[in-house]
Amino acid sequence: MDTAVLEQMLDETFDHAVVHHGYTDYMRDYEVIIYATADPRTGVAPAYLRYLFQYCVEARCETSVPAEIWRVSLDDRLLDHETADPDLGGYVWGVRCHCMYPGAELLPESEATRRWSKALGIDFHEVRIETNAHNLTLLFSDLQVSELPVGYAPSS
């Protein structure tokens, strides 16, 4: 996959929201479902987009929420946005999405990308996706982006 094209695809995720991420039900590819919005004055309708990271040989997910916020965010009443008690002062997990800020970036070639490229005979890339709750690092070969139909739900 051409790195300039890949970088452009990743740049288009800036400041949108991740609503789901995980391996597909067949366990080879990793999908990141994004809710993309624009200023209503543009006339661009919101859309759910599937970023399918193909041949994903490594996926790491780590929290971006600091420990001191975690400490005050353990209460289960923070799991539902509608009923979360603002007086608890913790992170409201129930928002059901994570803001992509600063977003996704293509990382420089690494030992891991070189090793997998050599082993499989295809190019590999590494991307870092930063949100306000989780940071993802994915090692993959190709990226496909598609708009999702209304009612799409990831397989479980």
Task: State the predicted function of each range.
Residues 1-156:
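Surface-exposed, interaction-prone regions used to assemble/regulate multi-protein complexes
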